[in-house]
Swiss-Prot record:
Name of protein: Putative manganese efflux pump MntP
Subcellular location: Cell membrane
Xref: HAMAP family: MntP_pump
Annotated Pfam families: Mntp
Keyword presence, Transmembrane: yes
Membrane topology: Multi-pass membrane protein
Cystine connections: none
One GO cellular component term: plasma membrane
Length: 201
């Protein structure tokens, strides 16, 4: 897998965390740079950890399903991407937003570490599934999780900072964009591994 694909996957995966970061930034009473860094570190850390766990699981079964690697990548990325798009257009907010709201408003003026951990886990489950597909692709897992974690950190920091001004609108668009990116990468991997275009043309 090339660097551009890894970066695009990182951006796509980070959109869920970005959306929650915007929600937090829009609702906590005082948004500061240090708060943005703290939130970014939590989300970025878990977003890097989950693919590593998924990769570790997938590598154990590589010999059994290596012939299906492109199908696994396509299916996982498409399901996750489709779910992100579906969730973003639902009328009701999902559980991640409800957790964020519960702790970000009222008497709670900022997010505590326990809440951030729950949010970070909730938004990185998709990355766990993607990590499984990494086991069947030619990627350097260490470099990949560093890129994923770093990009998520930066994007979440930005999300917190701008959440006050355009939280609701940008949150919805971010999830849709993230879903589209993941589906696109899934199709790209499938085409590359099957050489389907060369067979057609």
């Amino acid at each position: 897998m090339d660097l551009v694909s890894i970066i695009l996957i990182s951006i796509g995966l980070s959109m869920d965390a970005f959306a929650v970061s915007i929600t937090n930034g829009a609702m906590i009473s005082k948004v500061t740079a240090s708060e943005g860094i703290r939130i970014g570190l939590f989300f970025g850390g878990f977003q890097a950890l989950m693919p590593l766990i998924g990769w570790s699981i997938g590598i154990k079964f590589e010999s059994y399903i290596a012939a299906l690697d492109h199908w696994i990548a396509l299916i996982l990325l498409s399901i996750i991407g489709g779910k992100m798009i579906y969730d973003s257009i639902k009328e009701n907010r999902d559980n991640k937003d409800e957790i964020a709201c519960d702790y970000a408003v009222g008497e709670k003026k900022c997010l505590n570490n326990k809440t951030l951990t729950l949010l970070a886990i909730a938004t990185s489950i998709d990355a766990l599934a993607i990590g499984v597909s990494f086991a069947f692709l030619k990627v350097s897992i260490i470099n990949t999780i560093i890129i994923i974690g770093s990009i998520t950190f930066v994007i979440c920091f930005i999300g917190v900072m701008i959440g006050k001004k355009c939280g609701k609108l940008l949150k919805k668009r971010a999830e849709i964009l993230g879903g589209i990116v993941l589906i696109f990468i899934g199709i790209k991997i499938f085409i590359e591994h099957t050489n389907i275009l060369s067979k057609i043309f």
